[in-house]
């Protein structure tokens, strides 16, 4: 291994006179006893989330040709950049980059690395938590509407009420102290993600046998066809968000010179990506083939029969998002707790920890209640912040730290990913922002199977 560059030596999170080791208290590095299957289910939980349910809708906005190309290309590129980050986790002897921003400091410099990575990573993790609040609320509402059906049984409960119900569980789960303490929750969440994805495409396939003519051409929705196309690119990008927590997951795995953490981490990541492919490709392709351009923003909203199975699928989504929210919230807790103790000199107490975490849950809940627009949030955040942290920043750091030979295969692959990611970051948020503005102006709330009175 290479020596540690001068600009990243002695990067301590704790002041020299600190009477304890902060790393042993922070949620990311407090426990290092994970293994490859921890890596597998943490990555499945992190990657397979709200994005998979919106893939058929994204396909309807892109069309068969572009949709399949973007779907496959995104899977390949993000697997490659995930491998890069795993390799760079401990590329210098005696140094582990346990957090995304620490690797950014190694590549861009101590200050510039923070300025580049921290805002983007925070935006990703906060936006994921907001979208998961919305998706959890939507799924609970679907369960409610399917169970009661149309007519007099319908209540006046709106999606905002169900977001509040979903958020109440997060106040409890946020009390789990570190990454390894949420392993059980994450494992259940990973199983749930595979389960509801399977139900979604199998139920769609079953419905397809009885469906009449289906149209696959572009259809104007809330925005023009070109803007919808751009929006769909962001929705595709949102489906691959695991890079923002991959180093934090790897930090929980022990490492020795004989058995570096990258081996079990990569093994788990490969297993996770095989599972991701099993979830994403059937849902996207079968869902679009069955419903065409009439598919709803979430594939589960297009499915009504068999009612009991669709209700179960929606509950699986809720259970999965309970764990997935925590996987993305934990690095945010880690950052805030570190700053509060190291810079503002707060004592590391349970009161501090609970206050930080409950404030964060309440903030994401409030934003979700105010902006419950699933597809628009997916496309805007997917392009604006997911494209940089997932598609091209890992490649830029690889070029800086690994320095591959110019015009070599590695050099060319990285520049292709950088250009692809930059284009995605520039054009995708345009469609998402247009859709978000339209929904806010019209006051459009997600569809309901119950005919609720308008106020």
Swiss-Prot record:
<feature type="transmembrane region" description="Helical">
    <location>
        <begin position="62"/>
        <end position="82"/>
    </location>
</feature>
<feature type="transmembrane region" description="Helical">
    <location>
        <begin position="380"/>
        <end position="400"/>
    </location>
</feature>
<dbReference type="GO" id="GO:0098712">
    <property type="term" value="P:L-glutamate import across plasma membrane"/>
</dbReference>
<feature type="topological domain" description="Extracellular">
    <location>
        <begin position="434"/>
        <end position="455"/>
    </location>
</feature>
<feature type="topological domain" description="Extracellular">
    <location>
        <position position="379"/>
    </location>
</feature>
<keyword id="KW-0812">Transmembrane</keyword>
<dbReference type="Pfam" id="PF01490">
    <property type="entry name" value="Aa_trans"/>
</dbReference>
<keyword id="KW-1133">Transmembrane helix</keyword>
<comment type="similarity">
    <text>Belongs to the amino acid/polyamine transporter 2 family. Amino acid/auxin permease (AAAP) (TC 2.A.18.2) subfamily.</text>
</comment>
<feature type="topological domain" description="Extracellular">
    <location>
        <begin position="203"/>
        <end position="226"/>
    </location>
</feature>
<keyword id="KW-0813">Transport</keyword>
<dbReference type="InterPro" id="IPR013057">
    <property type="entry name" value="AA_transpt_TM"/>
</dbReference>
<feature type="transmembrane region" description="Helical">
    <location>
        <begin position="227"/>
        <end position="247"/>
    </location>
</feature>
<feature type="transmembrane region" description="Helical">
    <location>
        <begin position="114"/>
        <end position="134"/>
    </location>
</feature>
<feature type="topological domain" description="Cytoplasmic">
    <location>
        <begin position="83"/>
        <end position="113"/>
    </location>
</feature>
<feature type="topological domain" description="Cytoplasmic">
    <location>
        <begin position="1"/>
        <end position="38"/>
    </location>
</feature>
<feature type="transmembrane region" description="Helical">
    <location>
        <begin position="413"/>
        <end position="433"/>
    </location>
</feature>
<feature type="transmembrane region" description="Helical">
    <location>
        <begin position="159"/>
        <end position="179"/>
    </location>
</feature>
<keyword id="KW-1003">Cell membrane</keyword>
<dbReference type="GO" id="GO:0015180">
    <property type="term" value="F:L-alanine transmembrane transporter activity"/>
</dbReference>
<feature type="topological domain" description="Extracellular">
    <location>
        <begin position="60"/>
        <end position="61"/>
    </location>
</feature>
<keyword id="KW-0472">Membrane</keyword>
<feature type="topological domain" description="Cytoplasmic">
    <location>
        <begin position="248"/>
        <end position="267"/>
    </location>
</feature>
<dbReference type="GO" id="GO:0005886">
    <property type="term" value="C:plasma membrane"/>
</dbReference>
<dbReference type="GO" id="GO:0070778">
    <property type="term" value="P:L-aspartate transmembrane transport"/>
</dbReference>
<dbReference type="GO" id="GO:0015808">
    <property type="term" value="P:L-alanine transport"/>
</dbReference>
<feature type="transmembrane region" description="Helical">
    <location>
        <begin position="39"/>
        <end position="59"/>
    </location>
</feature>
<feature type="topological domain" description="Cytoplasmic">
    <location>
        <begin position="401"/>
        <end position="412"/>
    </location>
</feature>
<comment type="function">
    <text>Amino acid transporter.</text>
</comment>
<feature type="topological domain" description="Extracellular">
    <location>
        <begin position="135"/>
        <end position="158"/>
    </location>
</feature>
<feature type="transmembrane region" description="Helical">
    <location>
        <begin position="268"/>
        <end position="288"/>
    </location>
</feature>
<feature type="topological domain" description="Cytoplasmic">
    <location>
        <begin position="329"/>
        <end position="357"/>
    </location>
</feature>
<feature type="transmembrane region" description="Helical">
    <location>
        <begin position="358"/>
        <end position="378"/>
    </location>
</feature>
<protein>
    <recommendedName>
        <fullName>Lysine histidine transporter-like 4</fullName>
    </recommendedName>
</protein>
<feature type="topological domain" description="Extracellular">
    <location>
        <begin position="289"/>
        <end position="307"/>
    </location>
</feature>
<feature type="transmembrane region" description="Helical">
    <location>
        <begin position="308"/>
        <end position="328"/>
    </location>
</feature>
<dbReference type="GO" id="GO:0015183">
    <property type="term" value="F:L-aspartate transmembrane transporter activity"/>
</dbReference>
<feature type="transmembrane region" description="Helical">
    <location>
        <begin position="182"/>
        <end position="202"/>
    </location>
</feature>
<keyword id="KW-0029">Amino-acid transport</keyword>
<feature type="topological domain" description="Cytoplasmic">
    <location>
        <begin position="180"/>
        <end position="181"/>
    </location>
</feature>
<dbReference type="GO" id="GO:0005313">
    <property type="term" value="F:L-glutamate transmembrane transporter activity"/>
</dbReference>
């Amino acid at each position: 291994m290479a020596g540690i560059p001068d600009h990243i030596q002695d990067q301590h999170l704790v002041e020299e006179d600190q009477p304890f080791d902060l790393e042993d208290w922070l949620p990311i590095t407090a426990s290092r006893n994970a293994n490859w299957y921890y890596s597998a289910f943490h990555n499945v939980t992190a990657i397979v989330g709200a994005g998979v349910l919106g893939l058929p809708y994204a396909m309807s906005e892109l069309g068969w040709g572009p949709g399949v190309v973007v779907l496959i290309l995104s899977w390949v590129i993000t697997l490659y950049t995930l491998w890069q980050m795993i390799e760079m986790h401990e590329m210098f002897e005696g140094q582990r980059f346990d957090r995304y921003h620490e690797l950014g400091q190694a590549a861009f410099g101590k200050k510039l690395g923070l300025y580049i990575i921290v805002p983007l990573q925070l935006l990703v993790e906060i936006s994921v938590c907001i979208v998961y609040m919305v998706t959890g609320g939507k799924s609970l509402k679907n369960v409610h509407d399917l169970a009661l059906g149309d007519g007099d049984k319908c209540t006046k409960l709106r999606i905002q009420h169900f977001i509040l119900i979903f958020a109440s569980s997060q106040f409890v789960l946020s009390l789990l102290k570190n990454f390894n303490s949420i392993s059980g929750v994450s494992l259940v969440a990973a199983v749930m993600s595979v389960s509801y994805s399977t139900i979604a495409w199998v139920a769609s396939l079953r419905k397809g046998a009885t469906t009449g003519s289906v149209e696959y051409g572009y259809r104007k929705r809330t925005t023009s066809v070109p803007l919808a196309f751009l929006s769909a690119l962001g929705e595709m990008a949102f489906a691959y968000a695991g890079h923002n927590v991959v180093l934090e997951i790897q930090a929980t795995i022990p490492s020795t010179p004989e058995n570096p953490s990258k081996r079990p981490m990569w093994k788990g990541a490969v297993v996770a990506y095989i599972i991701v492919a099993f979830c994403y490709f059937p849902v996207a392709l079968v869902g679009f083939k069955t419903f065409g351009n009439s598919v709803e923003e979430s594939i589960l909203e297009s499915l009504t029969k068999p009612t009991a199975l669709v209700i179960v699928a929606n509950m699986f989504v809720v259970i999965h998002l309970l764990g997935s929210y925590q996987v993305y919230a934990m690095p945010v807790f880690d950052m805030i707790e570190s700053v509060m103790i190291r810079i503002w000199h707060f004592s590391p107490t349970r009161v501090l920890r609970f206050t930080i975490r409950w404030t964060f849950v309440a903030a994401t809940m409030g934003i979700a209640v105010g902006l419950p627009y699933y597809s628009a949030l997916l496309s805007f955040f997917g392009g604006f912040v997911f494209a940089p942290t997932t598609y091209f920043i890992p490649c830029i750091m690889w070029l800086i730290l690994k320095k591959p030979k110019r015009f070599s295969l590695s050099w060319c692959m990285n520049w292709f990913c950088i250009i692809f990611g930059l284009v995605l970051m520039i054009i995708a948020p345009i469609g998402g922002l247009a859709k978000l503005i339209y929904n806010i102006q019209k006051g459009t709330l997600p569809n309901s199977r119950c005919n609720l009175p308008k106020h």
